[in-house]
Amino acid sequence: MPGKVAKIGTFSDWVGMFDDWRKEIGVNHDEIANFKFDTLYGAIETEEIQFGAFKGRRKWDNLRQVPTQQMRDALINLIVYQGDTEFASVEQQRHLFESAPTDWDRKAITRVMIEEMRHGWQMCALLVEHFGYSGKVEAQKMLERRAFENKRLLGAFNVDVDNWMDFFTYTDFVDRDGKFQLQMLKYSAFAPLGRSMSYMLREEAFHMGTGNDGLRRIVEAGVIPAWLIQKYLNKWISSSYDLFGTDHSSSAHWAYVWGVKGRYDEPKNDKAPDLDDLNDYNRNLYHDEVAGLIERFNNSLKAGEPKLYAPHVKFNRAIGKWAGQKCHAQTGEPLDHRAYEEHVKDYMPSAEDKKLLLDIINNEKKWIAEKTGARDPLSTIGEVRKSAINL
């Protein structure tokens, strides 16, 4: 598809491109090919704008009601970035079906991919329906970029997810960043975007649960050493910190002023926002949630194993004020160049670490505890959708 000239006139045209995209990247298994993708809208808590300069006014139902072109541009940018991550994650994980540790896990990753595709579908439906020619162009480009060609918009979504330690850590923590982003968009003054979030959030909960439970099963099995698990936590959580955006972001500042993207805890937070520190505020909420989840894993560690932890927000950062800074993974303390080079070997996965991990996964049948008492993920995929407004 990349390089083709194809103009989208209607959403049906886009659906044809979506079908081609699935086939081209190799994720058109029967369960996926036979799934009925659709656009789902749920209820929003209030019809009034909840924050920013337009607080108290009625939320906007269409683009004509959005006051300025700058605000319309901000909305399309938010939707494009969100949609791009959804399709990227499918591309990142596309080779994992055959290596699933259990049949339940194979069905779980199938469901995760179906729902990520549906989230991308939802964002492209918004673009095509509400944003005219520009929206159609962006919806088309969404299916032309490729994670495995390093073309996705955010760096973490161009990294291969090619083993099940990566997958479980990714779905627990990168998808958890996704939860934060979706929740912030749920409060949007642009009502169609806010209504899109209800079912995306419910579906995202399954993805995070799959990752969190997968890591719990790995820790309980006690075959993969804790120091190796920690390296994968460091890899994906530090990438997730970057996904919250730069410090002192003018984009986040104006998105809040215009009412199109709130704080994660917006309805419960009655304090005046620091408009120049919004991304860091939400990032710190994420860190605290992640740290609590990891502490639970420690309850299942074998005696003598080192405790797991959330890496410091200064570690391994690629954007913001800590980008390129050489800081300790656990304490955040600054290190000199030579010390940091050695430190990274001990705290981030190396080629040798990956080889060890794959040796364990391929040769130790009990590297992960059995999944017990769980329903078939594909049999329950429609349950969160029963009350949706299906358009």
Predicted regions and their residues:
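Hydrophobic packing residues in well-ordered alpha-helices of helical domains and bundles
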Residues: I79, I109, F168, M197, ...
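Domain-scale activation on soluble regions of proteins
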Residues: Q183-M184, G214, D359
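Amphipathic alpha-helical
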Residues: G120-M123, L127
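Secondary-structure edge/capping motif, primarily at the C-terminal ends of alpha-helices
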Residues: L96-A100, L185-K186, I218
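Alpha-helical scaffold segments that form or flank carboxylate-/histidine-based iron centers
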Residues: G3-V5, R72-Q82, P101-H119, F167, ...
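Active-site-proximal alpha-helical scaffolds that flank and shape metal-associated catalytic sites
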Residues: G132-G209, I229-V260
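Solvent-exposed, charged amphipathic helical/linker segments at domain boundaries
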Residues: G214-L233, I237
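Terminal targeting/low-complexity segments that flank the catalytic cores of oxidoreductases
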Residues: M1-K107, E129-D162, F244-L391
